Structures are given as C-alpha cells and as structure tokens.
Amino acid sequence: MVEYEAPLRDYEFLFNEVFDVTPTMERLGYDFDEDFLSMLAEGWADHAKEVWLPINQIGDRVGLNFENGEITMPQEFKDAYNQAIEGGWLSTSTKPEHGGMGTPIFFQSVIWGEIATSTNMAMSVLPALTLGVYDVLNEHGDQTLIDYFSTHLAQGHWAGTMCLTEPHAGTDLGIISSKAIPQDDGTYRVTGTKIFITYGEHDMTENIVHLVLAKTPGSPEGTKGITMFLVPKYLPVDLESGDLAGASHDLMENHNGVTCAGSEEKMGIHASPTCVMNFDNSVGWRVGDLHTGMKLMFQMMNQERLATGIMGLGLAEIAYQNSLAWAKDRRQGRDLKGPKDPNETADNILVHPDVRRMLLESKVNNEGCRALAAWTGILLDQMHSDDPEEAEYASSLVALFTPIVKAHFTDVACETASTCMQVMGGAGYCTEYGVEQFYRDVRISKIWEGTNGVQALDLAGRKITQNMGKNLRHLMWPLTEFIEENRNIPEMSEFNKPLHQGVRGLQQLTLLMIAEGQANPHFLAAGATDYCRYFGNVLLAYMWAKIAKTASKKKGDPFYDAKIASARFFFKRIFPETVSLAAKIQSGHKSVMEFPTEMF
C-alpha cells in the first residue's frame, strides 16, 4: 500500500519563515495571510490523498484505451477529475471573473503541483497544460477569444494542449511543415501532423483546445515564420451565424477536423495519453501577431518546464516517503557497533550507514529543491508587480532559474527514485510496493519540454549572458549579501564558508564558459550539463544556508534541529560534488570532440 503525507509543515516553514511571503503577497494586492495558505494547502492535500492517490496504480495498470481514433480514460480518472472541478481545485490561481480563486501563483505552481504529482502524476499533467493555455490566451489572445474560451479552461471543463513537435521537427522547430491558410472571416484553416502531444485526445473534458504552431503563406524561413493558432477539437460556434459566442447546439455535432492517429505505448505514465494528432483543414484563430508563435509558445513552455521540475520533486518525495517507511519496518542484520533492538531478531535497516546515506541524500535533495521551488514560485508572482524594478528583477531570476529547476530537479528526482528502489531491495523492484512506478513515471521528466541537455545549453549559452549578464548579476546580489551578513557568525561558518567558495567557483566557471565558448562553441556545449549541475548545487547551497539560518533561531525544537542537521549533511556529503564538476568543465571539450567518430 502506497503511503503519502503532503509536506505541509515544510511549506509553512518555507513560505512563512524562510521567505516571509505574506508582506510580499499583500503588497502585490492579494487578499492573503498565513492561515489562508495553511487552510488551502491542507484542503488540497486531503483531496489529493483521498481521491487522486488511490487510483494512481489503476491508471498505471489499466491505462487508457485507444480505438478508432478515440481515447477512453479509466472511469476512475474521469470521476476524480470531475470531483476536482467541483471542489474548485483545478482553478485556484485563475481569475475570479473566470470562476477561479485568484490565489497567488506560487500556490498553484509549487504546492498544488507537488502534491498533485506525488499523488497522481498522470492525472496532474492535464490541468497543468490547461493552465498554460489559459495563461497564454489571456495575455496574448484577442478579447473575443478570451471572453469565450477562458471560463471553460479556467474551471477545467475544457482542456488545453500545446502542439509543437512534428515527425521531422523536434528541437529544430524552424522546419515544421504545418500550414495555416487565412480566411475572409479572420479565421485560418490549419493542416498538419503533430506528434508526442500530451493529452491530445481523451474523454476527460467536453472539449480540447490546442495551441498549434504553424506557418502562413509567404512566412519567413525558420522559427521567425512561425505563428500560434488556437484550434479546438469541437467548434464552439453557431455554424449559421458564425458567432463564436452563439453556440446553442451540441458540441459533438461540430467536429473541427482534429483527429488522433495513434497513442504511444510508454515506459510510464500509462494513463497520460501521448498522441499523434492530425489537423485536417481545421478552423483556428490566430493568437498574437503573425510570426510571434515561438515567443508565445516559449512563454507556455517555460511555464511547463517549471511545472516539470516540480513534477520531479513530487515523485521524488513520495518515493522517499515509501522507502523510508520500508526501512523503518524492515529488519535485517545488526548495527555494526552492536544491536539497537536487542529484544528483536534484527535491527531495522535504518541502522546501516549506506541505507542512511541513501535516505538522507533523498530527503536533503527533496527539501533543498522544495526551497528553491518556493523562491521561484514567489518570483512568479513578483513578475506581475506594478513596480517595474521588482518585476524586472523577478523576471530575470525566473529566466535564469527555469532551466535549472527543470534540469536539476528532474536529474535529482530520477536519481532519488532509483535510490529509493535500492533502499527497498527486491521489494523496490516489485509492482506491489509502488516505488518502481514512481521511477518509470519520473523518467519522462528529463525529456519533456526540452531535454535536460537542451536546458543546460539554454542556461550556459543564453541565460547567463542575456541582457548583458543582468540575470546573473541580479542573482549575485542576494547571494553576496547573505554571505557578508553571516561572515562573522560562528554558528553559520560551516554553511557560509562552503557557500562562499561555491559562489566564487560559479563566477569563475561562468567567465570561463563565456570566454572559451566564444572562441569555440564546442567548449561551452561539452561543459553545459556539468555547469548546470554545478549551478543547481550552488542554488541549493544558498537555500540550505538560509534554512539553517532560519532554523538556528529555534534550536531545541526537533523540526528545526532536523533542518540544521540536514543542512550539515548537504554541505558535507552532496555539495562537494561541485569540485569534480568544476574539474570536468575545466578539462574542456577535446576529449569529447576529438574522439574519432568511427570508434564509437
């Protein structure tokens, strides 16, 4: 039986104590306080545990059914999804005028996202994608589209997807062949095939709204010629009047030429459809200006990249909780220094140093990533500040953090899920205990929304030099300020000194990557993944130093003492990885690129 308890105490600690979020949210205009956050988080945690978690293994074992171009989801999934709609749990951060709660973005992106993924990753993807479509539409769509589609999307009655990839065009979207032909009434006729479309077809909602990248006649070559179009599965228009808001008949009678040609068989997330979608002269509406499709889609994609990082964290957390429960219950052997439970036939396996190491690595990485997720979530809200300086500062940090959250979180999550299987031995490999499903499900997170190698290239090749290096300078301000503030505090020395060394190392490696990368792009590309990992570790080091500083004010309380001990483990056993990462980056590209191709 899979166990799960949402880390509600950790959320309270991070948002209320480490980051003291209430004054920021009040300044941004939210009707918000600590009690409201706790009530909302507890309510969602209870719902997800009671409704979503029990059907997670059903989704894995039963999966979906694809027949005659239609996908039928497990009935349990449809029932659970509708319960979430009724409870308002799919519309927490959407606008009140569209039926949403209007909560701060950080609740939906961090707290909702982690709990949803822990309890049912396959289910969680659908509302995450729908929210992305809703946000892009409300920022860039014309008012007619916003007025008609937003409420349906915000409340979860209609679902959303993003359609980028084609059989011949994956990372290189500039060569897509999907076409959009303008019509006299202002609509477009969209034709093309898209692949790997998550939730492209299903029966969970009344309608599916696709954001499709396509090219219009005479468009420039490459990505500069791409435009975004909104293409619904069913046309919500009155066919006689052509009035978008005048639909008065059954949507099922008004199919829009959007069909599913296949559903991929996958390693994990079996109840999350991955579709081949055909658009055959389908009616669509342009979103944004002509030839701005890539810019608009990257807004949604960056949102989904952050969501994917949180998904990794969610699965790593539930994997850790279940392996910890197993370790406490499983008795094998004795402590090397003598029995801990002499009245039992054996000690539980938590006495063994290697088991403790594995569990501590899992716990500490999870909690460090959660702290960085919390900071990033708050920045997402600050991006919408009326203060231009605050908005610019937040935007630059979110741009910098996005590839790190996506890549570092999911790299670590896959390692954690594998480690948690190892803690459980043979039981971890068996389907009965659930952890092997978490590993299969989380593995896609390193591939989704741009592989982690692409994220590393984005960080090293673009984000650190973007805006004349402003992104990185904005990060260095709080880091160097924290280091200076704690330089002469003895109890912070064990955390502050290695953090300082890590930050200095990051600065030096960044200069090296820029200088050598300009001379030879192979240098930058060969070191990008290690640089991203190094950067991620430095950010987690900053989080753990802040956590230790906050917890030191309440020593003697087991919760806070555990935070300090966890910070100590991070700096002693995880952060030293940066030394080897730096050595690999500094070694350059020659051992990679000069290896003869014919010898592979």
Name these PLM-found stretches.
Residues 25, 29-32, 61-73, 293-307, ...:
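Glycine-rich cofactor-pocket loops
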Residues 466, 482-600:
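C-terminal amphipathic alpha-helical interaction region
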Residues 1-123, 148, 381, 590-600:
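Amphipathic, small/basic residue-rich leader segments at the start of a protein or domain
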Residues 187, 191-252:
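A short core secondary-structure module
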